[in-house]
Regions:
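Active-site helix-to-loop segments that bind/position phosphate- or nucleotide-bearing substrates
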Residues: 1-96, 100
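Short conserved micro-motifs at the rims of enzyme active sites and ligand-binding pockets
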Residues: 90-91, 205-208
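Feature targets compositionally biased, intrinsically disordered low-complexity regions
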Residues: 12, 125, 180-182
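Generic secondary-structure signature for well-ordered alpha-helical cores
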Residues: 31-38, 124, 128, 198-201, ...
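Conserved mixed alpha/beta catalytic, RNA-binding, or beta-rich assembly cores of soluble enzyme
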Residues: 70-136
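Short terminal or interdomain "cap/linker" segment that borders an active site or interface and mediates
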Residues: 82, 129-205
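Conserved active-site and cofactor/substrate-binding residues in soluble primary-metabolism enzymes
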Residues: 24, 28, 110, 114, ...
Length: 208
C-alpha cells in the first residue's frame, strides 16, 4: 500500500507545515489503512469509434471528452477500488473517533489515487502508444450518467466488486472509474482538476 502524505494533508485542508498533533493523527490513520485497504484493479482496451464518438458501441457524450480524445485511436477503460473493508472502517471511526475517521478517509483517498497512478504507469509501460492522464465521468461536461456504461463494459461487479447505485454513486465509496486515451500522438494535460468546471472545490489542486 502506497500513501502520499502530502496529498493526504491537502485532502484534510492543511496548508503549510502540519503541527505535531496532525502528523500523529495521520500516522495513526495510515496504520489503520494498512489493515483495511485491499486495492483491486481492472481494465479493458477498446478501439475508439468515430461518428459518433464511442467506446464498445457506446456513444460518449460531451464536448470535453471529445476534445480529450481528439488525438487518440484507442481507449482504456479502467476501474479501481479499495474495497468495502475500508469503507466500513471509515464509517465506524466516524462514529467512535471522528477525527481519526476523517483522517482515514483522506489517507484512503490518497492511497486510491496513488494506486491508480501506479496502474496507469503499468499500462503505459505495456503500450507502444502514448497514454493520456485519466478522465472520469463528471469531468467538465462528460456526464456522470455514463458511469453506468463504464460499470457495464468493465463488468466491475464481478471483477472487482464495484457496483453502481441508482444515484450513480460507486460502491464501495473509495472506487474510481475512468478513461485513458491512447494514441501515437496523444498529448495534453488539460485533464483532471483542470478539466473540471467547478470553481469552489475545496480539494481542487493549486495549478501554476
Amino acid at each position: 500500500m502506497k500513501t502520499n502524505r502530502r496529498e493526504t494533508l491537502r485532502y484534510l485542508g492543511v496548508k503549510g507545515a502540519p503541527d505535531e498533533r496532525t502528523l500523529a493523527l495521520v500516522e495513526r490513520a495510515e496504520q489503520e489503512a494498512e489493515a483495511c485497504v485491499f486495492p483491486r484493479f481492472t481494465f479493458r482496451l477498446f478501439p475508439l469509434g468515430r461518428e459518433p464518438l464511442s467506446v464498445g458501441g457506446t456513444p460518449l457524450e460531451g464536448a470535453d471528452i471529445a476534445a480529450y480524445l481528439k488525438d487518440c485511436d484507442e481507449v482504456y477503460l479502467i476501474a479501481a477500488t479499495l474495497g468495502f473493508e475500508a469503507e466500513k472502517r471509515i464509517n465506524f471511526l466516524m462514529q467512535s473517533s471522528p477525527a481519526l475517521g476523517v483522517a482515514l478517509d483522506a489517507v484512503c483517498t490518497s492511497v486510491l489515487e496513488s494506486f491508480l497512478d501506479e496502474q496507469c504507469q503499468k499500462l503505459q509501460e505495456g503500450s507502444k502508444k502514448r497514454l493520456k492522464p485519466r478522465f472520469s465521468c463528471g469531468y467538465g461536461d462528460f456526464p456522470l450518467s455514463q458511469q453506468r456504461d463504464m460499470v457495464r463494459l468493465l463488468d466491475t461487479g464481478r471483477k472487482i466488486g464495484v457496483f453502481l447505485s441508482e444515484s450513480l454513486m460507486l460502491a464501495p465509496q473509495k472506487s474510481v472509474t475512468a478513461l485513458v486515451g491512447a494514441g501515437e500522438r496523444a498529448r495534453g494535460k488539460s485533464e483532471g482538476c483542470l478539466a473540471c468546471g467547478k470553481k469552489d472545490c475545496a480539494f481542487k489542486k493549486e495549478l501554476k
